[in-house]
């Protein structure tokens, strides 16, 4: 793999991991249509996930620091973060159960381009209707256990290529009456255990040995980190300004175009 190839894949991973357009769907489409493209190796996949996870940690460093110290501080803010930590754990449970139980099915779906195209259309529908029906919703302090559980199920469903993780989790929280900024923030914090879990699974599949391409892979990871930071910042602004419609249209166009090509 060349440096350019690694940087382009890192850019793709960082942008599509957090923007509501499905990173897995774009990776599958790239594999089908880009000449000479092949699925990256396990180590490269691990480093890309590490780059995007670092982007969340840096962007939400205040939240992450307080979550880490929530059970060591007695004041009221720590109590709020202890509650948020419990909600994140609740959201992670269905993701882990469904993801591990149906892993082979989701892996098989990666090669079904018509299905991926339809799932992109579904993602567009979720974004459109959640934006259209949203109201001034509940803040983080009013998130409920049921909200977290439903968001976790949505995140699990997003393992299906073409379904956006951020798009589906933000959409279901908007449908549940959560404010846009709170929904996006909770969605990104939910990504940490999900991405960490995906990284751990990849590590378990990593054959022994050190790759000579580590400097190339590291370049891809750095690009995933930088583009991940940019995409998080962009999506937070889009949600605040109620402009998810733009991503809905993008998903519809991509899904429709590639469904027509692959059918």
UniProtKB/Swiss-Prot annotation:
It is a multi-pass membrane protein. The chain crosses the membrane at residues 40-60, 87-107, 109-129, 186-206, 219-239, 243-263. It is found in: Cell inner membrane. InterPro entries: UppP (IPR003824). GO terms for cellular component: plasma membrane. Keywords: Antibiotic resistance, Cell inner membrane, Cell membrane, Cell shape, Cell wall biogenesis/degradation, Hydrolase, Membrane, Peptidoglycan synthesis, Transmembrane, Transmembrane helix. One of its GO terms (biological process) is response to antibiotic. GO terms for molecular function: undecaprenyl-diphosphatase activity. Its EC number is 3.6.1.27. It catalyses: di-trans,octa-cis-undecaprenyl diphosphate + H2O = di-trans,octa-cis-undecaprenyl phosphate + phosphate + H(+). Belongs to the UppP family. Catalyzes the dephosphorylation of undecaprenyl diphosphate (UPP). Confers resistance to bacitracin. Bacitracin is thought to be involved in the inhibition of peptidoglycan synthesis by sequestering undecaprenyl diphosphate, thereby reducing the pool of lipid carrier available. This is Undecaprenyl-diphosphatase. It comes from Syntrophotalea carbinolica (strain DSM 2380 / NBRC 103641 / GraBd1). The gene is uppP.
